[in-house]
Amino acid sequence: METFFSLHAPNRMIKQKGIIDEKSLEKIQERKNLSNLLYEHRVRIIPLYQRINDSYAKSETINICENNLKMFYRDHQVCVNIDGKEIKLRYSEDEDDFRKYIIGGWFEEYIYCELLELLDKQVIYDLRLNMILGVENTNDIQGDKRPIYAELDIAFSDGKNLYVAECKSGELQNKGVLTALSTNTQIFGGANAKCILISSDGNLGQGLQEKVKILNIKFIFKDFKKNIENYINNSRR
């Protein structure tokens, strides 16, 4: 992956490499059943994002109970029960990470786990999660001017080209997200790099559909593993 960056953007800073080590992978695997449950019931979970955010900001706890859905978090202890299916686990990362996970990070981990199978099959290589990269030349940073960073939700290679994916579990309202996805993909991967918008919902408004088409972004909203593999194979031809 660093080969792409050194070739196309040699002066850009890599703040977070996005390499998932064995310990981090274990944590993702521990949460896999929860990520699967959240995806299965995403229509009910996603509208709760704002309430979850507000609750956590107020007391660093989450306590929601309605319509056969219970969600509890306090002091790293997690309990989610949806229609009688209950998952309990201890979230041992830093305190704010579970909030990030439950309001969208779970979908990134869900897609990451899907792509692990393509990694095993050697359809893709060098899979990364949550890379953070400088979008300015480090030489331009002077005095108190702070660098601007871009986060790549998921990045991988097919052995030849860079692929960057933006994962959206909630409604996409800002066209700027698509512009940033396209721009950053080209900066770090060159003209042949591919960008993918991965969404939990197939409903894109007219304006966003046009933007996706103009920017040549592949939109995938179901059968993620299969559709990503097909996209890679078609791109190789």
Model regions and ranges:
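Intrinsically disordered, low-complexity Ser/Thr/Pro/Gly-rich regulatory segments
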Residues: M1-R237
